[in-house]
Amino acid sequence: MNWDDLRVVAAINRCGSFNRAAKMLNVEETTIARRLARLEGSLGCVLFQAVDGQRRPTEQCRALLQPLVLMEQAAEAITLQLERQERPLRNFRLTTIDAIAQHYLAPTLADLLIAEPELSLQLETSDDNVDMARWHADIAIRLGRPRRGNFTMRRVGEMRFNLVLPRGAAPEDLVLAAYPDPLMEVPEMQDFQQYFPGRQARLRSANLRVIRVLVDSGRAAAVLPDFLSVDLVGDERFQVHRLPARREIWLLAQPHLRDDPLARRVTNWCADLFAETLAGDAV
């Protein structure tokens, strides 16, 4: 008795015919009949009878089916384990800004890694745009369209911004929070400076969550992206003003990954995270 013969029994039981069982196992119908006859000969009993054009298991066959199912499940588990052991991990380096990593990527990272057991992801955050030409990253998510470069790129989303300040506070009494000096030329900071011309920020940070905590104190004014401020819309403690500034979200990948199935699944996962940002305004 061998495992291939037992698999034939399981297939015939599932499919109800030699022909469909052969297609399921990707063998010839004559092979199915031969293996079944060999097994019936070794057991000394008939395992299937033809009833109304279907192959129905006999009583002796039904006695075999439950342990046979357990054997199939064990074989599948062993095969899966061996495949995982034999499949080498592939490391991709993904870079983006801290806020995107925390808000968009982190909540579903576990789902991605479980779905892709061969994937090892090195996630790095930086306020500076990485140099893809120097292979500082395999995949990058950045704000603003790259001017040039030897990489694939696609626009996957859009980031909108709100000015948030405590309701009823005098402008001169507000603590202003803004980005560090090197980032003051970005569109949202230009809008911010139009609201408070000539005023100097008392806090400068690229960490948007730190700025959000300061805003929550009720003593500060700052610019925050939608995903960190939309919950304040309708909060009587705050005024939330939509700013004209928009920042496009771009997904970049090294050119050699264009036709790589795993890389494509990772980049599609990234793109899907931002789909709602293109659907409409939150405020």
Swiss-Prot record:
Highest taxon in the source lineage: Bacteria
Name the Pfam families for this protein.
HTH_1, LysR_substrate
User: Cystine bridges: which residues?
Assistant: none
InterPro entries per the UniProt record, alphabetical = LTTR, LysR_subst-bd, Tscrpt_reg_HTH_LysR, WH-like_DNA-bd_sf, WH_DNA-bd_sf
Keyword set, alphabetical order: Activator, DNA-binding, Transcription, Transcription regulation
Stretches assigned to the HTH lysR-type domain: 1-58
Has UniProt tagged this entry with the keyword Lyase? no
What does the record give under GO molecular function?
DNA binding; DNA-binding transcription factor activity
Q: Tell me the DNA-binding residue spans.
A: 18-37
Physiological role: Transcriptional activator of the mau genes involved in methylamine metabolism.
Instruction: Spell out the family assignment given in the record's similarity comment.
Output: Belongs to the LysR transcriptional regulatory family.
Could you tell me what this protein is called?
Mau operon transcriptional activator
- Origin organism is Paracoccus denitrificans
